[in-house]
Amino acid sequence: MKLNLITLVVLLIVADLTLLFLPQPLLLPWQVALVIALVLIFLFIFLRRNFLVSLAFFVASLGYFHYSALSLSQQAQNITAQKQVVTFKIQEILHQQDYQTLIATATLENNLQEQRIFLNWKAKEVPQLSEIWQAEISLRSLSARLNFGGFDRQQWYFSKGITAVGTVKSAVKIADVSSLRAEKLQQVKKQTEGLSLQGLLIALAFGERAWLDKTTWSIYQQTNTAHLIAISGLHIGLAMGIGFCLARVVQVFFPTRFIHPYFPLVFGVLFALIYAYLAGFSVPTFRAISALVFVLFIQIMRRHYSPIQFFTLVVGFLLFCDPLMPLSVSFWLSCGAVGCLLLWYRYVPFSLFQWKNRPFSPKVRWIFSLFHLQFGLLLFFTPLQLFLFNGLSLSGFLANFMAVPIYSFLLVPLILFAVFTNGTMFSWQLANKLAEGITGLISVFQGNWLTVSFNLALGLTALCAGIFMLIIWNIYREPEISSSNWQIKRAKFFTLNLSKPLLKNERINVLRCSFGIILLCFTILLFKQLSKPTWQVDTLDVGQGLATLIVKNGKGILYDTGSSWRGGSMAELEILPYLQREGIVLEKLILSHDDNDHAGGASTILKAYPNVELITPSRKNYGENYRTFCTAGRDWHWQGLHFQILSPHNVVTRADNSHSCVILVDDGKNSVLLTGDAEAKNEQIFARTLGKIDVLQVGHHGSKTSTSEYLLSQVRPDVAIISSGRWNPWKFPHYSVMERLHRYKSAVENTAVSGQVRVNFFQDRLEIQQARTKFSPWYARVIGLSKE
C-alpha cells in the first residue's frame, strides 16, 4: 500500500466508522491498541513493508476513537438510579413550552469528571442559558425504547455526550453566569416579543429552537426545508461570504500596498466565527466552522488537492476532533449533501450545458444553475433521506428551489443585520414579514410527505442509480473527442459542451458503481423475500404498555396500541412509523381493554386507518367506523390463521383488566396466546380447554396478579414475552412470575431489555429476533442493568 496523507486519512475515517456497529466487548482499549501498534512498527523496521505502517496507524486510530466510546460508556454505566442534590449549569435548551427539556453539565460525585445530563423540568421560573441551579434530581441510567429500524434515543444521547437522565423535582437558582451570547439572546427575545415567528427568528440567529412552535416546525419538516432552520454549513458559509464581501468593500479604501488576498478570507472566517459563537457552537455549527478553518489553513499553506481529496481531509479532521460525530444524523446529512454535490458537479457539471452552442446569459445561467443544483441533490440525496427519515416530500424540490435563495440572500443577512444593529431600521419586523412570506409560500407544499417502506426505499435507490447511469451514458456515449472545442448537439436548443470529457476508464467505473448499487438493492430485496417467514408476531417496544402485531402477507392485525398523553402517544411515536417502515397494511385493531397503556393510541390508529375493523370488549366510543365486540366463543379465519376468542363472556360499558380480550391464534401447528391484562381468576376459566402453546404474551406486564401456576401448567409456553417499561414504578415483571416461567423452562423476552421482540414462524420452526442483543452496537446496549 502506497503511503500518503489521503490514504492515512481514509484509514482514520474507517477506524472511526467502526463505532457505528461494534459491540462493547470488541471495542479496543487504548493500551492494547498501543501495544499492537508498537509491535507492528517493530516488524516494519525488520521487514520494510509499508502495509505494516498503515496497519499500525489504523490500530492506533482504533485505540484513539474507541477510547472516547469506552470512556463515555463507562461514565454512563456508573450512574445509579437515585435522588441526588446536584449543582448544574444549563448548556442547551431543547424545549421550552409547558415544560422544559435541556442539557446541563454537572459533577455528580467528587471523584468524577463533569458530565452532561439530559433533564426534564417543569419549572415555575423559566430557566435561561448559562444559569447555575442547585436542584434535587431523580437520576437514572440512560435507557430508550428500541424497535427495528426505529429511532435509537440512546444513540442520540451518546452523540450529544450525555451520560445520565434526570427529572428535576425542585430547584433554586444560585448564579447567573452571564455571557455575551446569553445577554444578546435575552435582548433579542425582548426585541422580537409579539412577532408571529419569533421562534424562527431566534432559531436562525442563535441556533436555539426551544421557542419554535410546532406548526412552523412541521411546515419545514414536511417540505424538506428543515435544514434551513438548523444553523450549519449553509448558514456559516453565508456568514463567511458576507464577511468576505464586507472586507472587499473595505479594501477599496486601502492603499494598494496594504491590499492582500488573504485579508477577505480571514475576515470572512472571523465573521463566520462570530455567527458560530452566537449559535453556541452547536454540533452542526462546530462541524461547519471547523471545516471552514481547516480549508482556509490548507489554502494558506498553498497545498493543492482535488475537491474529493479536500472533502476526505475535512471529514477526517472533523472525526479526529469529535470521534462520536458519526452517531449524529446531522453529520450524515451534512457530509451526504456535500458529497452528493461533489459527485454531481464532478460528473455532470453545469458547464456542460449550453443554449444553441453558446453559454447561457448570466441571469438565465443563475436560474438554471439552481435547477441543476436541486436536481443533483434530488437524485443523489433522495436515497439518504429515504433511509434516514423513511420518506420524502414530493414537492421538496420546488420548496427548496424557492426557499434556499430567499434564506441565503435575504432572510439570514437581514437577521444578522438585526442582531448586530439591535433591530435598527425595523429590521426585526422586516425579517418577520419576510419569514412569514416564505413560510406561507412553502406551506402550500405541506401535506405532500410520502412515507416510504424499506423495500420501496431500496427500489427508489436503484431507480436513482439507474437514472444517473442513463445520464452518464447519454452524455458521454460518443467516441473519444479529437478536438477540445468540438461541440456535440443533442437537442434543438440545448447543446452539450464536451471540451472536458470523462476519461473512458473513469466513465466505465462510474457506470460499474451505479450498476453495483442497483444490483445490491435488488439482492437485498431478493434475500428479504427468500428469508421471509410464513407469518410473524411483533411485540413492539412501547414502554409500559402493550402493542402486539400479527403479520402475514404484508397484512396486519394490531392487538393494543400502547399509551397516550397530552400531545402525543406511542401510536404516533412507535406504532405508525413501524407499520409505514415495514409497508404493512393494517386490517384489524383489537383492544384488550380500555386502560390507557393498552388503548391510549386507539384514536390515532383509527384516524390513520379509518377502514380497519375494531374489536373491543366494551362499548366505549373510539370514533370508529366499524366495530364488533370481543366475546368468548367467537372465531374467524384471516390469511390462513385461526383466531379464537376465549374471554370475556360479556360486553361491558368500560373494560378493565378482568374484562381483557383473550385470543388464541394458531396456524394449525404453531399457536400464540394473547392475554392482555387478564387476571388469575380469568385464567382459571379460559385455560381449562387449552393445551401446550408456543408463545405466551405474559399478562399484565408480568404482574403477580396474572400468569398463574394453573395457566402455565396448562399451556407450558416455549416462549414468554413481557411488554414492560424499564423504569416502571411497579417494578414489573414480578420476581414470582419470572420464577414460574423459568421453572416451566420458557424462554423469557422482556421488551424493557430486548426492545422489540419478533417471533418468526416458518414451516418447520420458529425463530426469535430482538432489536437489542449482545451483538448490538455499544451505544444500544442496556446500560446500568447490573446496578438495578
From Swiss-Prot:
GO terms for cellular component: plasma membrane. The chain crosses the membrane at residues 3-23, 27-47, 51-71, 226-246, 263-283, 313-333, 367-387, 401-421, 434-454, 456-476, 508-528. It is a multi-pass membrane protein. Keywords: Cell inner membrane, Cell membrane, Competence, Membrane, Transmembrane, Transmembrane helix, Transport. Pfam families: Competence, DUF4131, Lactamase_B. Gene3D superfamilies: Ribonuclease Z/Hydroxyacylglutathione hydrolase-like. It is found in: Cell inner membrane. Coiled coil: none annotated. InterPro entries: ComA-like_MBL, ComEC_N, Competence_ComEC/Rec2, Competence_DNA_uptake, DUF4131, Metallo-B-lactamas, RibonucZ/Hydroxyglut_hydro. It comes from the Bacteria. One of its GO terms (biological process) is establishment of competence for transformation. The keyword Transport applies. Might contribute to transformation as a member of a membrane-bound pore complex at the base of the transformasome. It could directly interact with transforming DNA during translocation indirectly by participating in the assembly of the pore. This is Recombination protein 2.
